């Protein structure tokens, strides 16, 4: 899980979602998991 000031899609399978007022990226590739923080 990467914590970044700006999250973006790293591949076409990345999905941007919002959980508990946090913007997150979920993907089939675990290296692409990100959270805005």
Curated annotation (Swiss-Prot):
Keyword set includes Transmembrane helix: no
Domain of life: Eukaryota
One BP annotation, GO: translation
Keywords: Chloroplast, Plastid, Ribonucleoprotein, Ribosomal protein
Pfam families: Ribosomal_L36
Disulfide bonds, paired cysteine numbers: none
Entry GO MF terms: structural constituent of ribosome
Recorded family membership: Belongs to the bacterial ribosomal protein bL36 family.
Protein name per Swiss-Prot or TrEMBL: Large ribosomal subunit protein bL36c
Species, as recorded: Pyropia yezoensis (Susabi-nori)
Gene (name only): rpl36
């Amino acid at each position: 899980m990467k914590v970044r000031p700006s999250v973006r899609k790293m591949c076409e399978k990345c999905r941007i979602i919002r959980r508990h007022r946090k913007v997150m990226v979920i993907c089939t590739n675990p290296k692409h998991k990100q959270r805005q923080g």
